[in-house]
Amino acid sequence: MTPPNNPNHPLLVFRPAHERFRSALDWLESWHSFSFAEHHDPNWMGFGPLRVINDDTISAGRGFGMHSHRDMEIITVMIEGELHHQDSAGNHGVIRAGDVQRMSAGTGIMHSEINESEQACRLLQIWIEPSQQGLPPAYEQRKIALTKQQWIPVLDPNDHTAMAVARPIQLWRLQLAKGESIQLPGLGSPMAWIQLLNGDISISSETKASPSELHRGDGLGFRPNQARFSRIQSLSNQTDLLMFDLS
């Protein structure tokens, strides 16, 4: 198989949820779409600049102690519950469901992520390689107002309602009820990735590309100008997904 982060990657790269790497501790369940920590597979080192997608569930009262990052754009999308963040730059606060946090590690930053609540929390942590290394660390957190059946910008360097990272990529979040459908957003880059947070969808393609359905935890990388997916429809009562336009 051609590694998905190779410039000559195939038309479609399908990552079924059950084939992801799984880490399990007494306080953490983590599903890794790409190689991470002790899980290393040269065929799954990332997809273009998209280096990490981890689906983490953290038990109440537990979390990650202080640890360091460098030269990586780190995005945390809270799906359920809340998480307390603190870092070496003096930033601290609680990230709640619906919030998105952006942390540019740059020349180096240390941070902790602790679930101080009485309920488990679930989040998606995303790592994106920056276009330039050695930038100063930066931090931002926003509440993303979600409207069903609408692509909501999360990352977009040209949209003041969204955040931006040190790479010209776009990221949208979409929620659909059962039977609702929507056209894909305009994808201007040669690579795109869909990640299902919850629910099930069908995807229409002018080229009859497969798979035609995605389910919770599935990921799909594709070339927009060749796969030519046109429309997404929800097959479940509550569908929640992310769409990346990767440069």
Please identify what each model-predicted range represents.
Residues 1-247:
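Jelly-roll (double-stranded beta-helix
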